[in-house]
Amino acid sequence: MKYNGPCADTAGSAGEGLRKKGGTPMRKRNKVVSLLLAGCMAAGLLAGCGSSGEAQVATADNATAASTSTGAADSAAPETAGEVDGQINLRTVSFGNNFDVQDMGWRWMMAECYEGLMRDVADENGDRFEYAGAESMDVSDDGLVYTFHLRKDAKWSDGQPVTAADYEYGWKRLLNPEYGYSYSFYLFNVVGAEEYYNGQGSADEIGIKAVDDYTFEVTLKVADPTFQSKLVATPLYPTRQDVAEAAGDQWGKDWTKCVYNGPFAMTNLVEDNSMTWVKNDQYWDKDNVKLNQVNWYCVAENATAATMFDNGQLDVFDAAGDYIAKYDKEVEAGNMQTMTTEYPGTMVLCYEQSEGGKSGLMKNVNIRKAISYSINREEMVSAVYGRYTAAYGFVSPAITLDGTSYRKQASETMKEEYEQYAGDADKLKALFQKGLDELGITDKPEDITITLLSQGSATENQLEREYLQQSISQNLGVKVELNTVGDYQMFANERDNKNYDIFVGGWFSDYNDPLDFLNVMKTGVYDSYGLYSNSEYDSLIDSLTGENDNAKRLEIYQKLEDLLVAQDCGVAPLYYSDKHYYYQNWVKDFYTSSFGASQELYRATVEK
């Protein structure tokens, strides 16, 4: 999952376990709530219970009716948490406003209204996969053919059965070049998939087919050790062809035209204000879904959310900075609970490398390194966020290979050179000057302006850009101009128009393998990370195709990361993400998982 913005809300863990203490005992999952469209560093997900009223059953008919019920009551703050059993209030900083699962990079939210073949589950022992839309799976001896046997009791919210045809349509839709989905590459190892996407084949030639109503078959070109991990990703969820085609160009835009096959169904939306889900009474496992209603509230500022949390209007707070010390005292007093988890995400500094950026300097590796090495990561995570872990590699410690954290197997090779320059302004200025000389630039550093593109008005956003501005300016003797825009779309426009030199972005993994990080930097996969391109890097990525020996894969991963981060400084790692939750004592079994749906509410309960 990409995130290109000034900062991101991040959460979760992939197999490294979690820490919790205080209050009433709770089972937990470690996971991801990543903000794809809104930049709030520690804002994220807050859960609570409140809001009175009887939950309605979600169907295609009453979903449309509910969409009209927007008034003063919809924009009101939630009632005091804990007043109503069976209802939970969640806080976020943005609604994705995209309801097409094939395009749901912002999985942190709506994914709980849908369900794929498998789901990611996590507890104190780490993450594991379990069957969801599928009951079982067969894999051929050569690892090429996957046969999924679907649940016959799975239904959409309008009562229609979920069939293999829905998976076939959804997966082939993901590959349809007409739509240009960014996650289409997930299926390029399927027979005929990449050819179809590139306009060189037909949909009928793709190795994706519904054998019968409840048997779904996928044929790969070569055996792929990451394929099963991808099955929890939201772009591989099913889509009803009749519903999508009836919606036409409004598919994914108008939520009232959607049907849902997950534990919850959406019944109301007030843009940039509130969203309501109710328990999906057609869900195959509805008897184990304890919540009747989920209320989302859009609260941009951490300070506002903290006040709501203090007042009992919200039940979960993802804290940073001074809030951590404040709420730790409450935990010690037994007034709430806390949980800290890793999350498979890394925030990085991106450079405009295709044309050199507004300054014309970013093509030069020594310029990029000088900028990177001028940033004290340890100080940054402490002073700006009060959490997170300083990063000197691209792949998150939460990613595992053969059951062990990748970071325990691969050194952060950038760190050795970084430490030669860190804190030494004279050395940093000399490195920057070396880059200027290589470019034939005769301007003095004090006459050079570097543009930092950013977005977001929250305190953490402001602190982040000010810290970067000050660090780069003081260490290199250049001017750093802040190009701060009002929303994500404006940010994306500025980025795509290359109206910047640097910006902070990040990658939050969709499946548990280092490849999901490293593949995004291959030429042409994602152009929104500064357009890094290296033919040697691309060849190393290609060499992983068909390689199933994890020892050999690890060796290639190490070469890739060293080339990207240490040698080329294609991106400059800043910090590894985490989640630091505080919970009111009356919320039970609120899970977060590392991959697939970001939050798992289907087992959560609220008890006064």
Question: Predicted segment positions?
Answer:
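Detector for C-terminal structural segments
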Residues: S372-R407, E460-Q470, N493-K608
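Alpha-helical secondary-structure segments
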Residues: T163-G170, D213-T219, A223, G262-P263, ...
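Surface-exposed binding/hinge segments that line
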Residues: E168, S182-D242
